[in-house]
Design a protein with these regions (language model features):
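Non-catalytic cap/lid and distal C-terminal segments of serine-dependent acyl enzymes
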Residues: 1-239
Length: 239
């Protein structure tokens, strides 16, 4: 069974909503090619959340779950139907969350997915999951080994950021064509290269974290810019 509900920006304490100024694009900062100049301001949004509850689930029991970006994702639910029936994965809940609209620097989606912090994980933990449990009589595990995140493109880098910065919450990550490149905005001096820092500095210089990461990228998924941090294939290879 797939349930859906809508979340409004006015109800969020974490993401009140932004959008890039219409008709504008991010431009390279001539003083630092790793930075972007962006015109952006407050803007409301609505987002849909789809919750997959398999027929094998016993209401009220604790279950593992996966959180997906850029939802709703019907293909994920179909895949889980088959995998659960084949007993290749346990009976699990899936929460597929739409982004807050827009794309890249200055957008709500970019703010959520490309920011190098645990803020999106906090949003999911405090604003999304309690609604899921309350509305659909499900209990979501607190065990990080039984919690997974997944996403494609910037949703992929967000999935890893959720586990990296909130390792107390997530240990399992799936990414497709993860944007492990320099997409972050606003600029953060603690991670000047955005998600490029995962392979340039964070992973090499940090103690080992209990994260299991599955990655996929196609060899033609390639886009480069002069700052050297916008090559999707290279970024995933470096990971």
């Amino acid at each position: 069974v797939v349930h859906t509900f809508t979340m409004e920006s006015a109800d969020s304490k974490i993401y009140p909503g932004i959008a890039r100024t219409p008709g504008t694009r991010a431009t390279v900062d001539p003083a630092d090619p790793a930075k972007r100049i962006v015109s952006s301001g407050p803007a409301p949004y609505s987002r849909r959340v789809a919750v997959y509850v398999p027929q094998q689930y016993v209401p009220g029991t604790v279950a593992p779950f996966i959180v997906g970006a850029d939802g709703p994702d019907q293909l994920l639910f179909t895949a889980l139907d088959n995998l659960i029936a084949q007993k290749r994965v346990p009976v699990m809940i899936a929460i597929s969350i739409a982004n807050g609209s827009g794309d890249a620097q200055g957008s709500q989606r970019g703010l959520e997915y490309d920011t190098m912090s645990g803020l999106y994980a906090q949003f999911v933990e405090t604003e999304v999951l309690p609604l899921v449990e309350k509305q659909y009589n499900v209990r979501l595990t607190k065990d990080p080994d039984a919690r997974a995140t997944m996403g494609c493109s910037s949703g992929g880098s967000a999935a890893l950021a959720m586990a990296w910065y909130r390792n107390d919450l997530y240990h399992r990550v799936l990414t497709y064509s993860g944007t492990y490149v320099n997409q972050q905005w606003p600029y953060n001096p603690e991670s000047p290269g955005g998600a490029w820092e995962f392979h340039r500095s964070l992973i090499p210089k940090s103690p080992v974290k209990p994260i299991r990461l599955w990655m996929h990228v196609s060899d033609r998924d390639n886009f480069s810019e002069s700052d050297g941090m916008h090559d999707w294939v290279l970024a995933n290879q470096l990971m």
